[in-house]
Amino acid sequence: MGEIKTPRKWFLSSIALIYACAFASVYVQIPGLYGDEGILPVRLQMPKMQRPLLEQLQASPSLLWLGPSLGLEPQQVLELICLLGVLLSLGAVLLGTLRDSLTYLCLWALYLSLYNVGGDFLHSEWDVLLLEAGFLAVLVAPLGLLRSHSRHAFHDSLTFWMIRWLFFRLTFSTGVSKLATGDPAWYDLSALSHHLEDQMSPTLLAWYVHQLPEWLLKLGAVVMLHSGICIPLLTFFAPIRRLRLFGFYVQLFLQLFHILTGNCSLLNLLSIALSFSLLDDDHFNTPSKKRKGQEKKTRSWLQTLASGFVLLVELAVYAFILYSAITLYQLQIDWEQKRVSAKTDFSHGRFAAFVLHIQELTIWVGVLSFTWEAVNAMLKCLCTRGIVSKLWSLIQWALVTAAAVAVFALSVVPYSTLPGMSSTTVFPKVLDLYRAVEKFHLVGAYGVQHRPISTEGRPEIILEGSYDGLTWTEMNPMYKPGDVNDIPPVAGPHQPRLESMMFQATQKGHDHNPWFAGLLQRLLQGKADVIGLLQVDEAQYPFSQKPPALIKAKLYHYHFTDPVKDKTHQKAWWRRQYKKEFSPAVNLDDPKLNRLLDESGLKEKFPIQPATDTPLSQTLILIRDPIKHLSGALVISSLLATVASIFLIRVIFSSFTGGQKPRTASADHRNKKPKEPSETVEKSHTMSASSRPGKKDSNEKKVDSDRSPRKRK
């Protein structure tokens, strides 16, 4: 693989930007989720007995435990963590000097602090992925203290390879889990049609894509399955550069499709950031630069023969990908009806056997590819000039390789927990090491909690409130379907945690979701912070003047409307069908509600602490007030618009200055080369010749002086 300076820069900038979105999204929701009057007050996690700080950090690594030392309330500590994360990550996006290992270590520690105390609301798959990708960014980013003279080291390709291994695990595990769990929607290839309406937060474009012919949506399901299983196996670790580029663009296309039809989630952004590991610097060079570098190069017949062989192998891989798709999914073109039929040609048992055999093979492919990168980096270190430089490069290589080996070994543990895979390939020592560092979430499992696609429609919990128990009014959140006439919302890259948990809670009853009792309690009490999670606009919330006396929850199944079949829903985007009662009507004195609150620990009384009056506490209050009534999507959109504006100003300024930075006198002095003796002798001969008769007139001298390099300078 060639140089990776540019894709590494893109990866580090992308991770920093994703961190900024994640911290800002959590910050907006802290009062409603974790405040003293929130759904899951974070104060309840504070230790009842005073424990040494070091002991508390060892039990649960989080900066929350520093709150008493800073004179801050638990909620304010979370706000401080988020604000520090936003500032630090934006600094890394805008300033290249801040894209340092120390910066990414701080960002990872800040987000880990949120994750360990965030409960169910912060335990989604993209949170786990952000922690692992963020930790790898610590290894990928340069350590400025050790690289004062150079921003590139020989082991950079090795650390950047770890990003590719993570991207492979994410893509392959997600693709395999669709079929390994026996999901019938993927085996009959109707999954994409149902997925468009059953995903976390469908957009308006998803409604239009859902109207496409059934055969075209089945073909789309084939593309999604083949892109998640076959293409990563054949392209991600291929020694042929064009195959890796093919894998990159396929995954980029899929992620853009998910963003446009299912809102922009952190999972999609992280997948794009990880996909940069398939690129190299040559891909970012312009054609003119490539031609300029190849002008003096002439190919021998042996090089031409090798290039032809590589091209044949590449074409064979493309042909195999196409042939396997046609064979496994029985793709046939019906020229009369102008359609392509598709049907799976394998059973769940056959696929499970395939996964069991391919698992160990993928691990060994990873080991071989990792070994190649490590040996290649070591050879580059050995070729360094100077004994001291060579020794220093080898020391860095040894430390980085040891860390990479440890992370690679740890990643095999969650990778083997995928449905259909075996954990017998994991060594006991590796399992012990994994358990020892599990609380730091250095590696994660992906595809393990695969949610089967609902073929009966999109399940949604609809809250209803009433004053008298006779007239009920719906309380619909901002970022999920409620009123069938409301246009599908745009949320991304904001991550609405409450809507996400309500979507996942449909698989189980309210008894298995302790946070749901806390939600009902706060809505019955009329707490503004929790109401703000549902609607920031008071006019959209029916009980803004007085909280309801009773609240119940119903379970509906939503479907996209069909403009041809649904003649009665011409102005509606959804049609829904009532299924059952999710939660019976309760009030604040209901014994069932109080029992659920007791069981989940939310009924516990904590002493009301007097408001702290420290300068830091007052500053946090001042920062919170202006955005209290703004939606999370608006806050993050404003943040991204600010970053885009700064980059635009930079581009405009660079175009006016010709893209050159002003040079200092010291820089000019350093760049001056000492004159060669031959140049001095030649100059003396020229001067003696000019002193002879036949001198130039004054006008000619003036012209010559204007042409002088010194004059132009």
Task: Give the residues covered by each predicted segment.
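Alpha-helical membrane-anchoring segments
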Residues: 1-713
